[in-house]
């Protein structure tokens, strides 16, 4: 439940200050004399009490208008007000990956000076200066490569990716727990709103690549139970579920989703886990949008119409995502925003992509997914997480309204997340069981080839030597 805090108090004062002089007279001046005037006074006082109670108990219901005393051209003041009353939620940040690779999981190491400052894009001060209200922390593991050829390993070859994914989740949870005054771990959309109301940064987990789940829907379910709430269907490699954009960029065929990928989409819908289409090929995007029973997300992508980067979404996909109720969250990666001249990328390129998506898909379907700490270089003007307010100000300069900014900042992704949860509830109420499909290319080792013991029609095939010596 939302707590009473300065956000709610500020909004209440705004309501009081914005009432007309005549209405204040009714509410604040107890009329004397006739019963009618006394009833009017009581009615006015009761009405104001209801308004104030609703504001203080749920600050998210009171953010539809800016205070009347803010100059519409004072973009900094408008931004501060909006981000104080609506959570700014980034769809993708790789700080846990840096902790794993640079500190070998050791968040208690003295070198991890998160409180006093890091050279990376993210630390305590930068998050607070950037008015961040929620963050999807990425559990990212590289696509497995052959150590000699640097080529993708065969899909049925056992790798370390699932183990490392579990370690990455462990890092994220311990990191969040280490700073309880700053972060609150959440696994549902309601908690994300509660965290913001409590003055904390809601912290959520997304897995950046279904190659990390061991080709197994059973593993998928366990990762959900550990708190992961989205999975990027592919990273920079094909997997058993679908084609990656990187494959098409290298001249490979765009085969879209596999048959097993269709089972994966269905199970993600049943679980209430968001399907992330960043990194996937265009046909994988289209196949998923056709099959999914819930909205989808692009946690960190861009508009293909502005930059011919094959991992960006073309306009037909932007429109289909909107029709499905989903969201496209814009990334800050230079080489994708400006493939012709990455060093020239600036904050204005990001604004261009946001604006294009808003015009094609609508303001209900656009958000931000930076990929901070997952890319070595970011656009000028977006050097770290402290720069989000400036991004919002530039959108306002282009003409974005306060309501549109609130949607972009966090309301859209929270709506999508909530709708994915509701779709899962509906599917489960219908009685759909966990999907037991198994990838056709799975290799069964000898120890997994069970002897015929359970069933009468097969017991005659029992081979005593196979069972081993007593």
From Swiss-Prot:
The chain crosses the membrane at residues 40-60. Pfam families: Peptidase_M19. Glycans are attached at residue 188. Substrate binds at residues 235, 311, 371. It catalyses: an L-aminoacyl-L-amino acid + H2O = 2 an L-alpha-amino acid. SUPFAM superfamilies: Metallo-dependent hydrolases. It is found in: Membrane. GO terms for molecular function: metal ion binding; metallodipeptidase activity. GO terms for cellular component: membrane. Belongs to the metallo-dependent hydrolases superfamily. Peptidase M19 family. This is Putative dipeptidase TSTA_079200. It comes from Talaromyces stipitatus (strain ATCC 10500 / CBS 375.48 / QM 6759 / NRRL 1006).
